[in-house]
């Protein structure tokens, strides 16, 4: 039995039609997506601590908050952080580092971005929050005329980014400093 698109949307499903016996789409949570401000640093710190815990790291670092504040002060002129708010709290984030190429004669400098630090709280995953964050970030990049957006996805996130049009990038190289080992994750 098929359910109409209108009923599916009212029920919170993110797909045009739904088979009652076999639901193949995710429940959607509408989030407010906005750019971060200094006042959001405490909540960003909580999200970052949660990400660290999920990666198996210790989140009880007493100097972390001060380092985050200093990092934000340095990075805020070239980095845009999008936040997702749902149920009265921040539940996700994603950011874009903005790069501008050096101008050359006869050509204006182009801009490109590096997408990083994408994270949604476990209780809000698979509800469309990541998609809403990504649409906001890519919408900004498109409006600003970015020539490309790069990222280094986790294995689990590859299908998510592929659905948004990302694919393998030829012509890129990576150097890992000699003191780093393969046991150190390359994700951010």
Language model feature labels by segment:
Residues 141-153:
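Conserved GNAT acetyl-CoA-binding A-motif
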Residues 59-81, 95, 102:
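Active-site rim helix/loop that mediates acceptor-substrate recognition in acyltransferases
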Residues 106-122:
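Conserved acetyl-CoA binding element of GNAT-fold acetyltransferases
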Residues 83, 89-98, 114, 119:
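Conserved beta-strand in the GNAT
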Residues 32-46, 57:
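A short beta-loop-alpha structural element at the N-terminal edge
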Residues 124, 128-136:
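Conserved acetyl-CoA pyrophosphate-binding loop and the N-cap/start of the following alpha-helix
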Residues 98-104, 150-156, 162, 167-183:
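Conserved catalytic-core motifs of GNAT/GCN5-like acyltransferases
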């Amino acid at each position: 039995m098929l359910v109409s698109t209108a009923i599916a949307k009212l029920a919170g499903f993110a797909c045009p039609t739904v088979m009652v016996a076999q639901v193949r789409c995710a429940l959607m949570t509408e989030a407010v997506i906005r750019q971060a401000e200094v006042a959001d640093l405490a909540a960003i710190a909580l999200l970052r601590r949660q990400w660290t815990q999920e990666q198996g790291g210790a989140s009880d670092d007493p100097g972390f908050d001060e380092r985050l504040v200093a990092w934000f002060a340095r990075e805020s002129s070239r980095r845009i952080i999008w936040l997702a708010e749902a149920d009265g709290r921040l539940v996700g984030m994603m950011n874009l580092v903005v790069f501008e190429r050096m101008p050359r004669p006869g050509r204006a400098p182009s801009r490109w971005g590096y997408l990083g630090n994408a994270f949604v709280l476990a209780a809000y995953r698979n509800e469309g929050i990541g998609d809403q964050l990504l649409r906001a970030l890519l919408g900004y990049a498109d409006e600003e005329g970015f020539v490309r957006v790069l990222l280094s996805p986790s294995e689990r996130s590859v299908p998510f980014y592929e659905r948004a049009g990302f694919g393998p990038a030829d012509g890129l190289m990576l150097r890992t400093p000699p003191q780093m080992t393969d046991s150190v994750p390359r994700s951010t």
